[in-house]
Regions:
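Basic, flexible Lys/Arg- and Gly-enriched helix-loop patches that mediate nucleic-acid binding at interfaces
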Residues: 1-192
Length: 192
């Protein structure tokens, strides 16, 4: 792949903008020598403004999502993509969140541009456990382990029961919940 296309695909700018970066001497090798658009240089030796290039396709990011942000790309409010360097929004292929966390939920969020990895992790067939820590408004009742683990718990307005879930009490109003599925506001609705 030509350097212009590679650098543009990593989100540093359009091909035209990247061509201008070459013209301005902003693209160099690891030794600081100015590169030209048709040079053949290994990815790890290319620098933009003295900084190494971002990783190519196959990027996997771990992000601590604070409350108040959504995992959508189209939300008019604050989105998790705003927490990343602006060029990450221009990557090709695009970065996608691995699952979602509600606006009012904080925690680890994975992001990737690897569609196959995304599918392997998020596919319901994978049954990969997802662990959440819930802070509750009232004390645990004490029967949550039995109810959540039964595989018969029905959420309001749902037609199928939830898959069995694990729960560990961390305090009177704190619990660690392990799910193998992810329904809309599932944990909030399980404790309702």
């Amino acid at each position: 792949m030509k350097l212009v296309k590679l650098i543009a695909n990593l989100g540093y700018g359009s091909r035209k903008q990247v061509t201008l970066m070459f013209r301005d001497g902003r693209i160099t090798d690891a030794a600081g020598e100015v590169l030209y658009a048709d040079d053949a240089v290994p990815h790890d030796q290319v620098r933009v403004d003295g900084e190494p290039l971002d990783p190519p396709h196959g990027l996997l990011l771990m992000l601590h999502k604070p409350t108040g942000y959504t995992c959508s790309t189209k939300d008019p409010g604050r989105v998790v993509y705003d927490l990343l360097p602006p060029r990450y929004r221009l990557r090709d292929p695009v970065l996608s969140t691995v699952g979602r966390l509600d606006r009012d939920t904080s925690g680890l969020l994975l992001m990737t541009d690897d569609g196959a990895l995304l599918h392997r992790i998020t596919s319901p067939k994978a049954q990969l456990p997802k662990v959440y820590e819930a802070v509750l408004a009232s004390d645990l009742r004490g029967d949550e382990a039995e109810v959540f683990g039964s595989g018969t718990l029905m959420l309001e307005s749902e037609k199928t029961p939830l898959a069995p879930a694990g729960i560990e009490a961390l305090g009177p109003r704190r619990a660690r919940v392990t799910l193998v599925e992810g329904r809309y506001h599932q944990i909030r609705r399980m404790f309702a």
